[in-house]
Amino acid sequence: MVLIRVLANLLLLQLSYAQESSELVIGGDECDINEHPFLVALHTARSKRFHCAGTLLNKEWVLTAARCDRKNIRIKFGVHNKNVQNEDEEMRVPKEKHFCVSSKTYTRWDKDIMLIRLKRPVNDGTHIAPLSLPSNPPSVGSVCRIMGWGSITTTKVTYPDVPHCANIKLFDYSVCRDAYKGLPEKSRTLCAGILEGGIDSCKVDNGGPLICNGQFQGIGSWEGHPCAQPLKPALYTNVFEYTDWIEGIIARNTTVTCPP
């Protein structure tokens, strides 16, 4: 049953890529309730307001951005409408946090990744299912799906009750180098967006997935301010570049090292 559910979710994602996102993530539409069983929401014990998103890899592990780390993190699974609890909705706390560098330092172009082991595994449900790591590297020109509870307006922060989804395109990294001063010649990040502007990830979407051609290829890292401006794509941590590190940590391999 779990395999059937995962395959059905992947089929739904593929169908989503065939649709054009044309409305208000920014510039998107409300996600279908069955489209994002792997999407998780992060908040702290003191605040119920979501500050980041993440992706469920299996019953015990979540992948998100290093910039999403906080004290007393709470992770919610199976959430759609923040004000309406799903019957299979669950909450967990971290047991372990793994960063690509021991100091937890990261930059806007490198090592913005955090792997969380849950204190207690989550249960499979209608609205809870994992998303696999990518089996192939991403291809420039791919249509990618973004999603999250981030702001849906640029000039004034407006957080929706339900996650928004949108389609964007994957560009060569040089496009982001042209858009933002100070980016190094090479980076383990992906550049994605809409050059005309109007569609983009935004505040609180950090840590959420970038899904290209049905594969989990990126983690929301940072975007221009304000969001969704022309010629200002967002940057996403390249998940494929970190798969060996991720799989090693999950397998309890104490010798695994982060990519240089």
UniProtKB/Swiss-Prot annotation:
Tissues where the protein occurs: Expressed by the venom gland.
Residue ranges annotated as propeptide in the record: 19-24
SS bond partners: C31-C165, C52-C68, C100-C258, C144-C212, C176-C191, C202-C227
Record carries keyword Signal: yes
Signal peptide: 1-18
Listed SMART domains: Tryp_SPc (SM00020)
Glycosylation sites noted in the Swiss-Prot or TrEMBL record: N253
Compartment list: Secreted
MF (Gene Ontology): toxin activity
Name of the protein described by the UniProt record: Snake venom serine protease homolog 1
InterPro entries (alphabetical): Peptidase_S1_PA (IPR009003), Peptidase_S1_PA_chymotrypsin (IPR043504), Peptidase_S1A (IPR001314), Trypsin_dom (IPR001254)
GO cellular component: extracellular region; secretory granule
Record-stated family: Belongs to the peptidase S1 family. Snake venom subfamily.
Keywords in alphabetical order: Disulfide bond, Glycoprotein, Hemostasis impairing toxin, Secreted, Serine protease homolog, Signal, Toxin
Organism: Bitis gabonica
Gene3D superfamilies: Trypsin-like serine proteases
All residue ranges annotated as the Peptidase S1 domain in the record: 25-251
